[in-house]
Amino acid sequence: MISEAPPFWWRKADWRAWLLLPVSFLYGRIAGHRMAHGRRASVAIPVICVGNFTVGGAGKTPTALTIARAAKAKGLKPGFLSRGYGGSLDVTTVVDPDHHRAVAVGDEPLLLAREALTVISRRRVDGAQRLVAEGADLIIMDDGFQSARLAIDYALLVIDATRGLGNGHIVPAGPVRAPIRQQLRSATALLKVGGGNAADRIVRMAARAAKPYFTASLKVRGDNTLAGMKVLAFAGIADPAKFFRTVESRGAEITVAKSFGDHEHLTEDEIDDILTTAERQDLLIVTTSKDFVRLSGHPGKAAQLAEKCRVIEVDMVFEDHLAPSLIIDRAIVACRERRLREMKAGIKAMPGKAGPL
């Protein structure tokens, strides 16, 4: 999967998109066939997948965290499953936020592990087995909707209302990961994030396909006011502009804005440039929680930058505060129905304790 989304993906299709359409057609055929016909392994506990239609960030990780908190409030032990994108470890691993660094396990798994049991695995089936062995009674997949490796009981697709589907084309002509109709058939529900109208078309398509949708927004955690402050804001996420808007919404004046690639680890020169610029212009340094965890645990200038950063943390807040609990309940029911079908067909789930029924 392409890790960086070219800017033209998020604008009206131009000659670059049209030039790549033949490749997109082939990619879409393969991705759609895999989603429709992939042999999915089954686990004995409910699986919720938080995914999206497109490459890049839409708010999957904050959504997964919100669902995990709702699960814990219901007395469940949720476990996150991630591929560990951006990390170097290629073995199935239980993430320890006090021991591991982002360079090894990825930035998002470190954030998830602060909330609940988290396993990274290049093979999602192996990761799911490990979560069951570790005592999880609910799996929350952060991404992986299109992978067709694991049986999913509830697929929640997150879509950014300000970006939507971009130019609407499939990779590499655009940001869409697989044919939209196939993705909708495999989805359980949509989550529209933010107040824009770029997602209205896909929401209407979902409604015609009898798929429910929820609405939510990203809210800054705590009283993190920046009123009247001049700041240097840096972000290495899929949509840095969204972070910069969030900073400005807190009353800050962004004097310097620096964007880096999603999941990118800063070089010593880049860190030095941020520190020097902020000191020379007397600026407060602000960044995202993902960028902060990539700095944490490193010596030298990375530690200096981490110490000087103001971290702007955000939470995914559902308009209907009961929605996360409802999603969990629906996943549990779907898991029970899946297991009954498998029992009748003589299919055995992977070993592990039975999920909540």
Curated annotation (Swiss-Prot):
<keyword id="KW-0444">Lipid biosynthesis</keyword>
<dbReference type="GO" id="GO:0009029">
    <property type="term" value="F:tetraacyldisaccharide 4'-kinase activity"/>
</dbReference>
<dbReference type="GO" id="GO:0009244">
    <property type="term" value="P:lipopolysaccharide core region biosynthetic process"/>
</dbReference>
<dbReference type="GO" id="GO:0009245">
    <property type="term" value="P:lipid A biosynthetic process"/>
</dbReference>
<comment type="similarity">
    <text>Belongs to the LpxK family.</text>
</comment>
<keyword id="KW-0418">Kinase</keyword>
<feature type="binding site">
    <location>
        <begin position="54"/>
        <end position="61"/>
    </location>
    <ligand>
        <name>ATP</name>
    </ligand>
</feature>
<keyword id="KW-0808">Transferase</keyword>
<dbReference type="InterPro" id="IPR003758">
    <property type="entry name" value="LpxK"/>
</dbReference>
<dbReference type="Pfam" id="PF02606">
    <property type="entry name" value="LpxK"/>
</dbReference>
<keyword id="KW-0441">Lipid A biosynthesis</keyword>
<keyword id="KW-0547">Nucleotide-binding</keyword>
<comment type="function">
    <text>Transfers the gamma-phosphate of ATP to the 4'-position of a tetraacyldisaccharide 1-phosphate intermediate (termed DS-1-P) to form tetraacyldisaccharide 1,4'-bis-phosphate (lipid IVA).</text>
</comment>
<comment type="pathway">
    <text>Glycolipid biosynthesis; lipid IV(A) biosynthesis; lipid IV(A) from (3R)-3-hydroxytetradecanoyl-[acyl-carrier-protein] and UDP-N-acetyl-alpha-D-glucosamine: step 6/6.</text>
</comment>
<protein>
    <recommendedName>
        <fullName>Tetraacyldisaccharide 4'-kinase</fullName>
        <ecNumber>2.7.1.130</ecNumber>
    </recommendedName>
</protein>
<dbReference type="InterPro" id="IPR027417">
    <property type="entry name" value="P-loop_NTPase"/>
</dbReference>
<keyword id="KW-0443">Lipid metabolism</keyword>
<dbReference type="GO" id="GO:0005524">
    <property type="term" value="F:ATP binding"/>
</dbReference>
<dbReference type="GO" id="GO:0005886">
    <property type="term" value="C:plasma membrane"/>
</dbReference>
<keyword id="KW-0067">ATP-binding</keyword>
